[in-house]
């Protein structure tokens, strides 16, 4: 019994381990991987490994795994990666798993600076990545520092701006909050729609030379072949769509591309190693096949997948609507509960206020009753004193009258009578004065007693109002709510030194529709506005001395009004012969 081979396959978000037989082919292993992760759009992907010479290589599907140049390690390591890219992610990617794998791979490419991304776009993409991971921003859940462990922006961008890590996170948090209501899957798609407009997105670069020996870059992507100058990977100078190519072949380091235009010469370049020509051929064949397939009616399988994806998307929307309805209902009940508690607290406060007012009124009433009794007692004493003084005065008058009679009846000494008379007269005057004062006091006490009586009557009326006021209404009673949320290409098959492949262009519907495209920022005003705002914000913190060569090229392209698709239209102008001649002259 042959000993099994342990294999570890690393996808963008998981590690899978298998035990395969020595005679297992690359396709059998590939099929096992895609079945495990539930992927049906298999044509974009491949298994990559590092060969015995340290070069990254795609596993050949038609050969045994053990017969290829894989390293003898346990387990044998493979990466499951996108080998080919769609032209337009929004139109072509069908399954959520496909979309997620592309999102993670493109994000990694941007963060590692494999794909150049300008600062304002990097921040906006970072906010979509946060939405894709965390969902809607929630102030209660997403406290300060919730992004501290996330890789969000290329290190190059952070180094170029005088902003702390916290300030970067604050900016991304603000834009994260802007995406409220967006599904995680939708956030991934928005990320890819913006990322696919980056100049280096989806391109495989190879070092080549033309017949003159000029060092150049060959870019192979979903739309065709592009030629770049050695110091500029952002701006292609010449382009050839796949629909213009009928045959590709190589012999050793020489690569020959035959155009459909019979009058045009062959497009010839040289690669430094035979291995590179094999990879170029493999990518050309696969990209050409997908380019042509996209321009033909969908196969039955793709139609079924799209129908299923639409149904799943519709189901997700229904589930989301149900969740939103439940969430709104829950929020309404929570608000009602909070309102009830507030009203209850207000009623309790009002009740306490009533009780305090009642106690104060009772206390004031008691004090006023006591004061009124004191005033009444003082008035009574003053009245008695006044009556006593009046009695004394009357007695003095009687005595005076008696003395006068005695003076008339008796003859006394004039001096004695005069003295007695003067004495009683003075006493009478004093008593008269005292009587007047007492009368004034009595009048004043009577006035104060009347005021006290009026206050007493008023206080009794207030107390009567408080005591007879209706009690506060009881707090409303809410029934508890029961929540129920439903969960619910070909591969390398090259000969040792050479290979040739015919590329058919028959039956396609529109071979150059990619030249009509515009960027996401150009067709989406919201994205355009967000990028402009971010650019203005970041310009104030930018350190111009730390700009890279790619930054300078990108800014110059922006200044001249160029973008990926305008450049594409420009580099395909003229016939095939003119462009090949231009390539030879570089």
From Swiss-Prot:
The gene is Ezr. It comes from the Eukaryota. Residues 244-586 are annotated as: Interaction with SCYL3. Residues 2-295 form the FERM domain. GO terms for molecular function: actin binding; actin filament binding; ATPase binding; cell adhesion molecule binding; disordered domain specific binding; identical protein binding; microtubule binding; protein domain specific binding. Probably involved in connections of major cytoskeletal structures to the plasma membrane. In epithelial cells, required for the formation of microvilli and membrane ruffles on the apical pole. Along with PLEKHG6, required for normal macropinocytosis. A head-to-tail association, of the N-terminal and C-terminal halves results in a closed conformation (inactive form) which is incapable of actin or membrane-binding. Residues 306-338 are annotated as: Disordered. The modification Phosphotyrosine is found at residues 146, 478. It is a peripheral membrane protein. It is found in: Apical cell membrane; Cell projection; Cell projection, Microvillus membrane; Cell projection, Ruffle membrane. Signal peptide: none annotated. Pfam families: ERM_C (PF00769), ERM_helical (PF20492), FERM_C (PF09380), FERM_M (PF00373), FERM_N (PF09379). Glomerular epithelium cell (podocyte). Expressed in cerebrum, cerebellum and hippocampus (at protein level). Expressed in the small intestine, lung, kidney and ovaries. GO terms for cellular component: actin cytoskeleton; actin filament; adherens junction; apical part of cell; apical plasma membrane; astrocyte projection; basolateral plasma membrane; brush border. Phosphorylated by tyrosine-protein kinases. Phosphorylation by ROCK2 suppresses the head-to-tail association of the N-terminal and C-terminal halves resulting in an opened conformation which is capable of actin and membrane-binding. S-nitrosylation is induced by interferon-gamma and oxidatively-modified low-densitity lipoprotein (LDL(ox)) possibly implicating the iNOS-S100A8/9 transnitrosylase complex. This is Ezrin. Has three main structural domains: an N-terminal FERM domain, a central alpha-helical domain and a C-terminal actin-binding domain. The FERM domain is organized in a clover-shaped structure that comprises three subdomains identified as F1 (residues 2-82), F2 (residues 96-198), and F3 (residues 204-296). In the active form, the subdomain F3 adopts two mutually exclusive conformational isomers where a row of four phenylalanine side chains (Phe250, Phe255, Phe267 and Phe269) must point in the same direction. In the autoinhibited form, the F3 subdomain interacts with the C-terminal domain (residues 516-586) and stabilizes the structure, selecting only one possible arrangement of phenylalanine side chains.
